[in-house]
Amino acid sequence: MNRIRATGKRLAWAGAVCGALLSGAAHAQLDLQSLGASLLSGGQQQAAPAQGAIGQLLQAYVGANQQVLAGQSSLASAMGLTGAAGQAQQAASLLGSGGNVLTPAALSQMGGAQQSVSQALGQAFATGGAARGPVDKQAFSNGLASLGQGLTQYSQLQSGLGGLGSTNPAELLQAGLNPQNAQAASYIAQSAPGQLQSLAATLSQAVQFATSQGISVPSVATSALKLLP
């Protein structure tokens, strides 16, 4: 009877973690360090719930980055940077439809594309105008909204990603995660802080440029800046 109760508590805990990630609330974040410790002490009965919780975290990461890339693409298009806009769109396709298709190689390529697009945008902002003709103000405002929303989602994952970084890769495998996703999870945990910092700088530059050009700045963009380091 005690064993049944303990198993029930573990399953309820894992279900609560998944629900917290899906809710998107700022304080609903995953402590994967505790998850790893529980797995080592709790045996295989927790494997499926734990796998689901980590899978939800990876899918949330994918969703945030797709939103960011959509924002970068809109900003680049607004500035006449067609090559950079296409690069952002291509990078979004690397992420597929969810965490089940992630690979370290795809994540590295996606991160490189984000950085390249950010650099192109930064150079365009510095020159004070679009590459061809006037700035498309509506597309720029839409890009700010998408980038701000993506970074808001991203910032809400930081606690969970930090816990992921402190979890031994062997524990991820014990949680039922396949080796490919376990490698991707470890890569994300290492690269996410620098990635967030770089994208926050891009959003800040874009907001400053919009203000100087009389472009409407969506509230989600300014709110995101307050959440970011």
Locate each region found by the language model.
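Bacterial N-terminal signal peptides that target proteins for export
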Residues: 2-14
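Long, low-complexity, polar and repeat-rich extracellular regions
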Residues: 61, 228-229
